[in-house]
């Protein structure tokens, strides 16, 4: 099992932050999004297959509001990714949401 951590720098007016890139086939076991700010923050998350351009069809969470200093856990199902697939995210405030991805190679 491995862990990937990032701050979400991308906002809806710029490019999303790539918070995980699959190296080979992998299974994402859980994702945590922690709001470290003193205000609520909206987060949108996408899973983009290798070679594709980000689009609405890749959305897995849309404008999810995370309360001040709260954490949202996403982990009820495993997400299987192929080599080069990415998890990308936008946040309404730059560098205030910590994204932690737990995954394993398969």
List each language-model region with its residue ranges.
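Intrinsically disordered, low-complexity Pro/Gly/Ser/Thr-rich segments with frequent PxxP/GP/PP motifs
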Residues: 50-86
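Acidic glycine-/aspartate-rich tracts in secreted/extracellular proteins
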Residues: 36-39, 50-52
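A generic structural signal for short beta-strands and their flanking turns/coil linkers
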Residues: 27-29, 39-41, 62, 70, ...
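C-terminal interaction-tip segments
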Residues: 1-26, 30, 49-51, 84, ...
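Short solvent-exposed strand-capping/beta-turn motif centered on an Asx-Ser/Thr pair
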Residues: 33-38, 92
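Extended low-complexity, serine/threonine- and proline-enriched intrinsically disordered segments
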Residues: 45-47
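A generic short-segment signal for beta-strand/edge and adjacent turn/coil regions
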Residues: 1-2, 11-16, 31-33, 56-58, ...
């Amino acid at each position: 099992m491995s862990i990937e951590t990032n701050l979400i720098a991308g906002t809806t007016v710029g490019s999303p932050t790539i918070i995980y890139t699959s190296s080979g086939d992998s299974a994402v076991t859980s994702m945590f999004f922690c709001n470290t700010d003193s205000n609520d923050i909206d987060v949108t998350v996408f899973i983009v297959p290798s070679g594709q351009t980000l689009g609405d069809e890749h959305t897995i969470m849309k404008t999810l509001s995370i309360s001040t200093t709260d954490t949202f856990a996403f982990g009820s199902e495993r997400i299987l990714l192929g080599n080069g697939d990415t998890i990308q995210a936008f946040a309404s405030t730059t560098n205030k949401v910590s994204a932690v991805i737990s995954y394993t190679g398969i």
